[in-house]
Regions:
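Active-site helix of classical SDR
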Residues: 119, 155
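SDR active-site lid
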Residues: 172-267
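Conserved glycine-rich Rossmann-like NAD(P)H-binding loop of the short-chain dehydrogenase/reductase
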Residues: 28-43
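Substrate-binding pocket helix/loop in short-chain dehydrogenase/reductase
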Residues: 95-96, 100-108
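Residue(s) in the substrate-gating loop at a strand-loop-helix junction
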Residues: 139
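The beta1-alpha1 cofactor-binding region of Rossmann-like NAD(H)/NADP(H)-dependent oxidoreductases
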Residues: 59-69, 101
Length: 294
């Protein structure tokens, strides 16, 4: 890993921040991207002090020109891109027709189009050298949907399909040096719920069980070294994914009931919340969200 050039989007918190720290300790050269510029610069300083060499590039991945500029900055600064991690993501929770359409659009533009943009510019660079690892962060909801997450699930289904289609293209054209990995985490204790827009009328709560996000952080670094096509992180997700192949109706009904209980029936009433969909907010600046009891 030493001296590899790694681009990480969504680096101001959650999986992206954790992965950046791990990559820095491995001696990589990092290009850190997110909307929160102050947090990016703080993280870059931290990474520079722990063995890596990092630069901060404030980026809104829903804007194609900013993602293109991010890729160009990486090449200009370090000469190439070896690994690209598409982690930036947002969510909007609520009954589909009660969430503002502008919020659904923003979820798709950030989660799906942002991943498409990053994948496109990363692969353009990889193809020039016939080498590279693309790691896209999807979700277990990209395999099994849940109520109140309609646009989020749609975006993550799209990310899963994107990775599968690109891998087919690479295989059919016998391009063996480029790898596309899709990570599908179960509910993880990240700041996701600090940032997600919430129109359920209840306090946000993850669908249990809730896992330590360090599992995903570790998986990202492992995939950069030893790529595999798809991986679900969280034992419950692995079991549910297999069961869904044989009894999709039963598993989707179970997921719906679990979501209804955890996020509506057992959750205190709360006002609507716009979250960080359209503008970044200060809350949720670490890898963990603090909702999981150790």
């Amino acid at each position: 890993m030493k001296q590899k050039v790694v681009v990480v989007t969504g680096a101001s918190s959650g999986f992206g921040k954790g992965a950046a720290r791990r990559f820095a300790k491995a001696g990589t050269r990092l290009v850190l991207a997110a909307r929160r510029e102050n947090l990016l610069h703080e993280l870059a300083d931290e990474c520079n002090a722990t063995g890596g060499r990092a630069i901060a590039v404030p980026t809104d991945v829903s804007k194609i020109r900013e993602v293109q500029a991010l890729a160009q900055k990486a090449v200009n600064e370090f000469g190439r891109i070896d690994i690209w991690v598409n982690d930036a993501g947002v969510g909007a929770l609520g009954m589909f027709d009660q969430v503002p359409l502008a919020d659904h659009i923003q979820v798709i533009e950030t989660n799906l189009l942002g991943t498409i943009y990053g994948s496109y510019f990363a692969l353009t660079e990889f193809r020039a050298r016939e080498s590279g690892v693309l790691i896209n962060i999807a979700s277990a909801l990209g395999k099994i949907p849940a109520p109140y997450y309609a646009s989020y699930a749609a975006s993550k289904y799209g990310v899963v399909g994107l990775g599968a289609a690109i891998r087919q293209e690479l295989r059919e054209n016998k391009i063996t040096g480029i790898h596309v990995c899709t990570v599908m985490p179960m509910a993880m204790d990240t700041p996701f719920f600090d940032h997600a827009a919430n129109y359920t009328g209840h306090e946000t709560a993850p669908i249990p069980p809730l896992y330590d996000p360090q599992r995903v952080v570790n998986m990202i670094v492992e995939l950069a070294i030893d790529p595999i096509d798809e991986v679900i992180v969280g034992a419950a997700g692995k079991v549910a994914s297999v069961a869904h192949q044989f009894a999709p109706g039963a598993i989707e009904s179970f997921m719906a009931r679990q979501t209804q209980k955890s996020q509506i029936e057992r959750a205190p009433v709360a006002p609507f919340f716009a979250g960080a969909l359209h503008e970044p907010i200060a809350a949720g600046a670490e890898v963990r969200g603090g909702r999981r009891s150790e």
